[in-house]
Amino acid sequence: MSLLEPPPETHNKSKAMAFTLVALLVVLVVVLWFMFRYYPEKKVTAQFFDALVAGETDRAYGVWKPTPSYRKDDFLADWGPSGYYGPVKSYKILRAKAPDKSDSVAVTVAISRFAPMPTEADANSAKTKTVTLWISPSDKSMSFPP
């Protein structure tokens, strides 16, 4: 190399490209984690409400995994065709979150006596109820919040 020759070029493009790809991968992992972190709890909630919509209260009671104090009669008084929340003809899972200092996941669901789920402009939307269920991540049992 002579005095008048320029120094050899260093290729920093590959380092910048690698850094960019790693950063994008990290962002993708974080976004996917936030999207799917409560997926199992949402899935068991959907199974429960799918059974209620189909009118299969026995299957819904099994998905609920009740404690001995929550008898089938109590379940039907809440979720049966003439129960407080029934008949459930359509539903929409609104959100799922883990409350502070809790080992359960709170899943909030809008339920309606009408199918399909009424829009906000529909007059039947006033009869839509919102219920929060607690799902235990360990065994996917359901309960009402304390």
Outline where the language-model segments fall.
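Short, intrinsically disordered/low-complexity patches at protein termini
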Residues: 7, 81-86, 93-97
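Broad hydrophobic/π-residue packing in well-ordered secondary structure
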Residues: 48, 57, 63, 133, ...
